[in-house]
Amino acid sequence: MAAGRASRALPRAAVAVVALALSGAGAVAETLHVAIKDLGFGPTAITARVGDVIEWTNTDFIAHTATAENGDFDVEIEPGATARVIVSKAGVVRYYCVFHPDMKASVTVLAK
């Protein structure tokens, strides 16, 4: 009798896995890379989804920040360092470097 239960449970489990995959609920967060070089962000515009990670790598010889105008994030990135932020809400976020205000970029965050 236990073998009969196991054989019935397998198709149910397979259906649950397929349903989860089709729903997108198991989607893996993406990491979007932004380089800081020559007093600039590159690329200057990216698109992410809620839950994705933005990763800045500072290859300049001086410190920079990635500071959101709306307050969503504010990270300081030392020379040779990397900083990461998980985006948590949809919308367009413009950000800049506090030390070098002409350094500007944006991220468009889409809902999951």
Regions of interest found by a model, annotated:
Residues A2-P11, V17-V18, L22-K112:
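Extracytoplasmic copper-binding redox domains, predominantly the cupredoxin/blue-copper superfamily
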